[in-house]
A protein has these predicted regions:
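C-terminal-of-GTPase-core extension/linker across diverse P-loop GTPases
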Residues: 3-36, 41, 47, 174-382, ...
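Conserved G1/Walker A P-loop phosphate-binding module
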Residues: 12-112, 116-137
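Short capping/connector residues at structural and topological boundaries
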Residues: 36, 62, 67-70, 77-79, ...
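Phosphate-binding glycine-rich loops and adjacent basic patches that engage nucleotide phosphates
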Residues: 42-47, 75-87, 115-139, 151-160, ...
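Glycine-rich, flexible loop/turn motifs
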Residues: 53-61, 68-70, 78-81, 110, ...
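Amphipathic alpha-helical transducer elements in NTP-driven molecular machines
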Residues: 62, 76-79, 92-98, 112-126, ...
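Conserved Switch II/interswitch segment of TRAFAC-class P-loop GTPases
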Residues: 70-73, 102-109, 123-162, 166-167, ...
Length: 395
């Protein structure tokens, strides 16, 4: 919900605000997850299943940007219920872009497989979903002959480390020339050499300690692969799903590694996800119930991604559209308004806020307001997950 004050007119203009939001919302930046994994771990099966399931789960149009990129909707019953409440013309969920990172295999940094082709796809993702094989199957040969997910993790991590070292060495060469008469460049070279030594020791960039804020700024320029958040997708056999693979030693090893690494982990069966992708919503619910599951792998991955990246959603609602908007936890009202349109942030006045559950319970914003459940919040208000917001702005 967005309200604008027409310039010099002193009145609320719903039409203009909604038209602006409708016009600009498709350009909203999507969260982007890159899916990596060695051959025969289930990576491509999982990618194909998730993108197809995400396309069927909601009315957001599935988009295949190229054979390795798919956009899926984030399941969110809150906007569906708001859509029913407002008899809205359009329900728009938040979306995630999945990228199937091809060619990231052992020796890729030295030209094996597709060589460094994977770099162009993985560099801009927000987080990496690393599919690791945690199932035994004699009919599916592992590239290294046996199942060892920690070895597989190390193999992929080393390729990312080598790619980062190459980027940093080029940066060092460039900045060394400037360092003769530039103190900031000299400081950057010193930091980069320490960072390269850190990586050469087999450590990820995310564990590198920076001395001060200036180093943090210089570090961020490089957009390093080994600094990206990682979610491990433990691909298991169907029998391991019911108890979340509690007795699977491979999964336990991954969980322990992820805990030390500060990464996320979730259990999934790519083969089951492939079957789920072919079902409609009712069939999917019955299928999951038969398996003793409450949610699909796509839903588990989305939750793990939101948790790891510190994300949440606020909602806007009206007769024309009900929509979920993804923001970082801790985002203040003006910046949340800016997700819809920069004018909303620039001309922010107030945010009329009601909790999603309260709005549903009382049936309208007016009724919730009468109960004292609607707050008029200023620029310092920190938006909460599930807030339904009516922005007031003046431009």
């Amino acid at each position: 919900m967005t309200k604008g004050v027409g310039r010099g007119k002193g009145r609320w203009s719903w039409q203009r605000a909604l038209a602006v939001a409708e016009e600009t919302s498709p350009k909203e930046r999507k969260m982007k997850l890159g899916i990596v994994g060695l051959p025969n771990v289930g990576k491509s099966t999982l990618f194909n299943s998730l993108t197809k399931a995400g396309a069927l789960a909601a009315n957001y149009p599935f988009a295949t940007i190229d054979p390795n990129v798919g956009v899926v909707s984030v399941p969110d019953e809150r906007i569906e219920k708001l859509g029913e409440l407002y008899h809205t013309k359009k329900v728009t969920p938040a979306v995630i872009e999945f990228v199937d990172i091809a060619g990231l295999v052992k020796g890729a940094s030295k030209g094996e497989g597709l060589g460094n082709q994977f770099l162009s796809n993985i560099r801009e993702v927000d987080a990496i979903v690393h599919v690791v094989r945690c199932f035994e199957d004699a009919n599916v040969v592992h590239v290294d002959g046996n199942i060892n997910p920690l070895r597989d993790i190390e193999t992929i991590n080393l390729e990312l480390i080598f790619a980062d070292i190459e980027v940093l060495e080029r940066r060092v060469a460039k900045q060394t020339r400037a360092a003769h008469n530039d103190k900031k460049a000299a400081k950057e070279v010193d930091m980069l050499k320490r960072l390269i030594a850190h990586l050469e020791a087999g450590k990820m960039a995310k564990t590198f300690e920076l001395a001060d804020e200036e180093e943090e700024e210089l570090y961020a320029i490089n957009n390093l692969l080994t600094d990206k958040p990682v979610i491990y997708a433990a691909n298991v056999a169907e029998d391991d799903l019911a108890d979340d693979a509690a007795s699977n030693p491979h999964v336990q090893a991954v969980r322990e590694f992820a805990k030390e690494d500060g990464s996320g982990v979730f259990v999934i069966c790519a083969q089951i996800e492939q079957e789920i992708a072919e079902l409609d919503d009712d069939e999917k619910a019955m299928f999951l119930e038969d398996l003793g599951l409450s949610e699909s792998g796509l839903e588990k991955l989305i939750k793990a991604s939101y948790d790891l990246l510190g994300l949440m959603s606020f909602l806007t609602a009206g007769e024309d559209e009900c929509r979920a908007w993804t923001i970082k936890k801790g985002t203040k009202a003006p910046q949340a308004a800016g997700k819809i349109h920069t004018d909303f942030e620039r001309g922010f006045i107030k945010a009329e806020v009601v909790n999603y559950k309260d709005l549903l319970e009382y049936g309208s914003l007016a009724a919730a307001r009468e109960k004292g459940l609607v707050g008029m919040e200023g620029k310092d208000y920190v938006v909460q997950d599930g807030d339904v917001i009516l922005f007031r702005f003046n431009v």
